[in-house]
């Protein structure tokens, strides 16, 4: 039986690969997409997500979400993904539109209609998920688990200790981590290992039209290089759903720093139990890189 999932995203070049995997992995049933401001503005992430759905002729409803973090000013990652968020490929025009309600309400409504609890996957800042949990707490029993790409047990990628998705809205992340729902965190500890090699990248233009599109996007992606390999951060959250055996997880207490002058946005991962607090997150700490690369090749070969 396919696993029903809702995907919250901020496309983003590596988001595009994750969306492809969510659509084409035969084990998954992507039922709803929502967008959030992150890599670029929410208007741009929504446009990019709709372009991808049109590219794949995927009839998946999409709702636009939060334009700004809960408390602080927005930050983006246009230096990594380009000003549009998906620089490098010219998508054809379409007339698709997002749903007429905010993302967190679209998630609420879909959860309440679902015949069984649904897995949420969040590969951008956690603003929409925090709004859902704070404004609609009645939804918690209908969430099977939340799988996120975000955080780190060690170093960061936008500050010395903070990963971008958490640092973009630390207050939202803190709300989510305190919520009591089951959380799997695929952070930089594994995503920095999730590298597609130059040899594989060179094969993409001949793979299928998805491969051609991704190859064009990758030429503008600044998380690695076409010559040294590219890190597929967001794809790890999808990979865990399908191939959890590729990941080494440890239950840990995780809190999000929201006040520190130099540490705001840091995920404080208590690997050794120093704080004596119960674990609230399953933290991915290691990755079978070869197995991950093989799975990516398999799932992208299934794309249109």
UniProtKB/Swiss-Prot annotation:
This is Non-specific ribonucleoside hydrolase RihC. Belongs to the IUNH family. RihC subfamily. GO terms for cellular component: cytosol. NCBIfam families: PRK10768.1. Gene3D superfamilies: Ribonucleoside hydrolase-like. It comes from Escherichia coli O6:H1 (strain CFT073 / ATCC 700928 / UPEC). InterPro entries: I/U_nuclsd_hydro_CS, Inosine/uridine_hydrolase_dom, IUNH, Nucleosid_hydro_RihC_nonspecif, Ribo_hydro-like. Keywords: Glycosidase, Hydrolase. The active site is at 233. The gene is rihC. It comes from the Bacteria. The lineage of its organism: Bacteria, Pseudomonadati, Pseudomonadota, Gammaproteobacteria, Enterobacterales. Its EC number is 3.2.-.-. The keyword Hydrolase applies. Hydrolyzes both purine and pyrimidine ribonucleosides with a broad-substrate specificity. One of its GO terms (molecular function) is purine nucleosidase activity. GO terms for biological process: purine nucleobase metabolic process; purine nucleoside catabolic process; pyrimidine nucleobase metabolic process.
